[in-house]
Swiss-Prot record:
UniProt-listed HAMAP family: MutS
Entry keyword annotation includes Nucleotide-binding: yes
GO cellular component assignments: cytosol
GN (gene name): mutS
Annotated protein name in UniProt: DNA mismatch repair protein MutS
Length: 848
């Protein structure tokens, strides 16, 4: 901290406050500006592209200063928060007119990336998530809150960093807090993690915050229901919110345990590989999200994060989709929904004290749509719709109140008044009347003064510094009445006041102040009245979100030709004419669909061969995406789908170097493969694309074969694409394995991809033809054809290599007996891929 005593009283005050928030930008209120000083000023100037100036001296150097206008601060703060930084708002709480020295100031709120409610700070379609991780005895206890939802969720405890990473990254949090320094050091989330002081994770403090945040009955129920570690992590969130809000987070209305294990699990790598919910235009989420409200878009994202395996829930969703498709009800529903605003976040802003007058207008216009929506839903007689409709609350008394109280186009804030309608409050109308009638008084007063002085150029005016005045040109100085009191001298004129005008000024200014105070009182009373409907509005918001998602699914089903899937418990996966939605949307010609048939009774492993660009990866991805869509309750892109009991989707598709961790492409591939091998079960869907490409041919082939064998033994539903044709021989060893391939046709030295899956193994890989399509020059292609011909004849070396080559055939090496003996000791039916890799390395060393 700077040496305080060497500074002015104002800077001394600033430094004392700043010392409490060393890692946060401090917005220090000075009149109509928020000012920043020292390093904060330098950082803000760069972040916000504002001017860096100076104020006073510190150790002989100018003190850096930057500032933003108070009325425009929200936009600047939003820029900072969206960069993952936090801001402390320091307001003037004392009265400047009575203060001796600097006016009293204190931090009234801390704005962090996950604790914002204002519209400017938020992505309307995404939840703003704060995650807390409490590490104890190598266990991770997790809780999170979506700030404007008003709920805290507990997640089941995890015991390893892989599961922790998948849980946290699936949530896509804006902010992570923890008691664990090791999580910061490991950096497993690739995003900042904030380590809080120990007291945030004190069980004693946790109980205190729970008791302070909820009524006694609910608080005691929570204290009795959850274990010590769960209460501690709940308390850490409440403590953090209390510190940022500078008040108890009363908007938190519930604590939920997300213990439902009946979900389709997909790790973060598989999510990325399948492009489920990333930000790309071709992501499945982007294709499926045509919701009319931000409420619906956020709920759809929650469905994407936790697809349910509860067939009853899925059946209810399917029934609603079918009902919405009948008579095109979804169109009428979506039309109404398009007029409904984000009432969930608006009511949260009311509870948090950050609501704006225009929010109340938006809330009112949304509530006015509910009678039409409820009436339309009553025509659809399904149990799920009836249940949802019962939780849409038609709050007529509130809409009447808001219609009567708030002007149609209110100002941005209540600060300067003009929000409450004329006729709502008699006292306010009378105070405003004094102000509004001032024009008539001033007009009469000016006319009277002109007559009295005989000066027709006399003017009566007003400014904020000097108040009301009578202005006369200096040439009339000899005609100024004796009762005029000089107030201000200008270059060519003089300004005066009279006792009568001064009395009027006092009356008007007093009326303005009283009117503003009265209006603020009415506004606060109105907000308290709105807050009485908090639970009803939150329930209504949740119900509207469900209706929006299901209407969206109905629209997508018709627009994208999706059909209702079936589910079975027999371990069968039967899909006919499946399509890949993203590719289908981005090609001009018709998409070529494909069938898939796997079953625990027949085949669980497909070895897929065929040329690059032939359709192997698309085929595998479309199967995984189709199953995912089925489990979120959507219809699917296939003419028929009967889906077995699948609890997890694993994918190993593509790879690149992980430079930050010092891992090669091959190491990344093997790490992901090991994770799948160690976790896959009979209820898993496994997608493996080109395993073993990142090492030598023999190593890669050996690993790919070992992995395929392992999946055959596990019995997981596996789609295994490869260019190693040797793997097609596995059908002779494992009866639950079958071959399919993607055809290509040659005509006049050109290749044409059929994109159709056919039974059996491919005969060729067509690599040179694909290289031709890619633009490889003719001389290189001719050389490649020659090399290929030599290799196919069984030659050990290419003609272009003249120098002697080491021959690695086992029967010609001195180590022949040792290698043979070692190979004979290996049980290839029980060895793991990693063990196989180690043995290969061991054998290679003996040949060097």
């Amino acid at each position: 901290m700077q040496e305080v005593s060497n500074h002015t009283p104002m800077i001394q005050q600033y430094l004392k406050i700043k010392s409490q928030y060393p890692d946060i930008l401090l917005f220090y209120r000075m009149g109509d500006f928020y000012e920043l000083f020292f390093d904060d000023a330098k950082n803000a100037a760069e972040l916000l592209d504002i001017t860096l100036t100076a104020r006073g001296k510190s150790n002989g150097d100018s003190i850096p200063m930057a500032g933003v206008p108070y009325h425009a601060a929200e936009g600047y703060i939003a820029k900072i928060v969206k960069k993952g930084l936090s801001v402390a708002i320091c307001e003037q709480i004392g009265d400047p007119s009575t203060s001796k020295g600097p006016v009293e100031r204190q931090v009234t709120r801390i704005i962090t990336p996950a604790t914002v409610s204002e519209e400017a700070f938020l992505d309307s379609n995404q939840d703003s998530i704060l995650v807390s991780i409490y590490e104890k005895n190598n266990k991770y206890h997790i809780a999170y809150t979506s700030y404007t939802q008003g709920k805290i969720h507990l997640i089941n405890t995890v015991t390893n960093s892989s599961d922790l990473k998948n849980q946290i990254l699936k949530l896509s949090p804006q902010e992570i807090i923890t008691n664990s320094n090791s999580l910061v050091e490991k950096n497993i989330f690739n995003k900042p993690v904030k380590v809080l002081e120990e007291w945030y994770f004190s069980n004693f403090e946790a109980k205190k915050h729970i008791l302070n945040s909820f009524d006694n009955s609910f608080a005691n129920n929570i204290l009795n229901l959850y274990k010590k570690e769960q209460l501690t992590v709940i308390g850490s969130i409440l403590a953090y919110l209390t510190n940022t809000l500078k008040s108890t987070p009363k908007h938190i209305s519930d604590i939920l345990l997300d213990e439902d294990q009946n979900i389709l699990n997909i790790d973060i790598n598989s999510r990325n590989n399948l492009e489920l919910d990333n930000n790309s235009k071709s992501s499945l989420l982007n294709i499926m999200d045509k919701c009319k409200t931000s409420l619906g878009s956020r709920l759809l994202r929650r469905y994407f994060k936790n697809p349910t395996r509860d067939l009853n829930k899925i059946s209810l969703r399917h029934n609603v989709i079918k009902s919405f498709k009948q008579h095109h009800y979804f169109l009428k529903i979506q039309d109404i929904l398009s007029y409904i605003n984000d009432i969930e976040r608006i009511i949260s802003r009311v509870a948090l004290g950050t609501v704006k007058p225009k929010d109340l207008v938006s809330l009112n216009s949304s509530l006015e749509q509910l009678p039409k929506l409820k009436s339309l839903l009553e025509k659809i007689n399904t149990s799920e719709i009836i249940n949802i409709n019962n939780h849409i609350h038609q709050i007529d008394e509130l809409t009447k109140l808001l219609n009567k109280a708030i002007v149609d186009n209110p100002p941005m804030t209540i600060r300067d008044g003009g929000v409450i309608k004329h006729g709502f409050d008699q006292e306010l109308d009378e105070l405003r009347g004094l102000k509004d009638n001032s024009y008539d008084f001033l007009l009469k007063f000016e006319t009277l003064q002109k007559q009295k002085t005989g000066i027709n150029t006399l003017k009566v005016g007003y400014n904020r510094v000097h108040g009301y005045y009578i202005e006369l040109s200096k040439q009339y100085a000899d005609k100024v009445p004796t009762e005029y009191i000089r107030r201000q001298t200008l270059k060519a004129s003089e300004r005066y006041i009279t006792d009568e005008l001064k009395a009027f000024e006092d009356k008007i200014l007093s009326a303005k102040e009283k009117a503003l105070a009265r209006e603020k009182l009415i506004y606060d009373t109105l907000l308290n009245k709105v807050l009485e409907y908090y639970s009803q509005i939150q329930q209504t918001a949740a119900s509207i979100a469900k209706i929006d998602v299901l209407a969206n699914f109905a629209e997508r089903a018709i627009k994208l030709n999706l059909n209702q899937p079936k589910f079975n418990k027999t371990g069968k996966l039967d899909i006919k004419e499946a399509r890949h939605l993203a590719i289908e949307q981005n090609i001009d010609e018709p998409f070529i669909p494909n069938d898939t048939l796997l079953s625990t009774d027949t085949y669980t492993l497909e070895i897929i061969t065929g040329p690059n660009m032939g359709g192997k990866s698309t085929y595998m991805r479309q199967v995984a995406q189709l199953i995912f869509l089925a489990y979120i309750g959507s219809f699917v892109p296939a003419s028929y789908a009967d889906i077995g009991d699948i609890d997890t989707i694993y994918t190993r598709i593509g790879a690149s170097d992980d430079i930050s961790s010092g891992r090669s492409t091959f190491m990344v591939e093997m790490t992901e493969t090991a994770y799948i091998l160690n976790n896959a079960t009979k209820k898993s869907l496994v997608i493996m694309d080109e395993i073993g490409r990142g090492t030598s041919t023999f190593d890669g082939l050996s690993l790919a074969k070992a992995c395929a064998e392992k999946f055959a033994k596990i019995g997981a539903m596996t789609l295994f694409a490869t260019h190693y044709f040797e793997l097609t021989e596995l059908v002779n060893q494992y009866p639950n394995t079958k071959n399919i391939h993607f055809e290509a046709k040659e005509y006049k030295d050109n290749i044409y991809f059929m994109h159709k899956a056919v039974a059996g193994a491919a005969k060729k890989s067509y690599g040179i033809q694909v290289a031709k399509l890619a633009g490889i020059s003719k001389d290189v292609l001719d050389s490649a054809k020659k090399n290929l011909a030599n290799l196919e004849k069984g030659q050990d070396k290419l003609d272009t290599i003249d120098q002697p080559q080491q021959n690695l055939q086992l029967d010609q090496t001195p180590q022949k007996n040792h290698i043979k003996e070692r190979l004979e000791t290996i049980d290839i039916n029980s060895i793991t891929p990693i063990e196989a890799l180690n043995i290969l390395f061991e054998l290679k060393k003996t040949l060097i």
